A protein has these predicted regions:
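A beta-strand edge to alpha-helix "cap/lid" segment located at domain peripheries
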Residues: 19-31, 87-159
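Acidic, Ala/Val/Gly-enriched low-complexity intrinsically disordered segments
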Residues: 2, 6-18
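Hydrophobic alpha-helical context, especially transmembrane and signal-peptide helices
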Residues: 1-2, 66
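Short, low-complexity N-terminal intrinsically disordered segments enriched in polar/charged residues
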Residues: 13-62
């Protein structure tokens, strides 16, 4: 298990609070696999824009990169806007991790399910993340069933 350097004894909620209240930003003190799950639950499931923005700043490098079969975006605002588009295209859908994430040497992957809460496996896939200095530097999303699968037709592109 790789531990990301940060403030000893910090928890995710306190880090989010520090970012919201004081603008502080430090690397997380959690194992990378736990951050992969938190990425789904605290960022991609979060409907509150302020909390999501704080979580993005807590978990992603400022110059991060995100790519799926539909588009690629850069930076915190790019990730934030991508999640907004996902929520607009699929109201009420949620992500759930499918089993534990695995990680080594700054690379991690997390299988997931996405859909209505009562049928959360409507769309499945895997996130692959590259970590640098304790933050997600790049996140690549692969949707089961081929490039973009059926989601590509329903997930609007940016700009």
């Amino acid at each position: 298990m790789v531990i990301i350097p940060a403030v000893a004894g910090a928890d995710f909620a306190s880090i989010e609070s520090d970012i919201i209240m004081h603008g502080k930003r430090t690397a997380m003190s959690f194992a990378i696999p736990d951050l992969m799950s938190a990425n789904l639950l605290r960022i991609f499931n979060e409907r509150n824009r302020r909390r999501r923005a704080a979580a993005i700043r807590a978990m992603y490098a400022k110059d991060c990169f995100f790519a799926d079969a539909i588009e690629s975006v850069s930076g915190w605002d790019g990730v934030h806007d991508k999640v907004d588009r996902l929520h607009a295209a699929h109201p009420g859908f949620v992500f759930q991790p499918s089993g534990p994430a695995v990680a080594h040497h700054g690379l991690a992957c997390q299988r997931w399910r996405f859909g209505p809460p009562d049928a959360c496996d409507a769309i499945t896939g895997i996130d692959v993340a590259i970590f640098e200095k304790g933050f997600i530097k790049a996140l690549y999303v692969f949707i089961d069933g081929g490039p973009g699968a059926s989601l590509a037709r329903r997930w609007p592109r940016s700009g």
